[in-house]
């Protein structure tokens, strides 16, 4: 079963954790100095916040799958709809290793589709890079036209330097 994913950039982890813990009546499933994640079942959502990325607000949206088959189904659906799909393969971000790919909606909002393979002790295993002003985990590159695995090329605002 798929789980909806929302990742927000926040200015203060402490204030945001206090707010969202009260809102959800639940403590985060994962809490770090720069990141928190709630794995809620009602509604079924992976809600994450971090201080990495750009200005406060929506960093990216997405779908987390329970297995590789569901992830492949999402990718096939996007390709059949002629959407540009940027595949990352296996990537580390947000204290996890995942198989993932990205889409961008017509307004430029990044959509992550991923299957988490396991947790890691650091935000990312990439070489540290300066904070960027766009999606925290979106593929690293200057604002450009993505070369999709399938579908048509779409202008996707990407990080000049990914945070994870």
Model regions and ranges:
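Short aromatic/hydrophobic contact patches that present stacked aromatics
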Residues: 5-7, 37, 60-62, 100-102
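Vicinal oxygen chelate
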Residues: 13, 62-110, 118-121
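Short acidic/glycine-enriched loop/turn segments that link adjacent beta-strands
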Residues: 32-35, 55-57, 94-99
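Short, charged/polar surface micro-motifs in flexible loops or helix N-caps
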Residues: 41-45, 54-56, 66-71
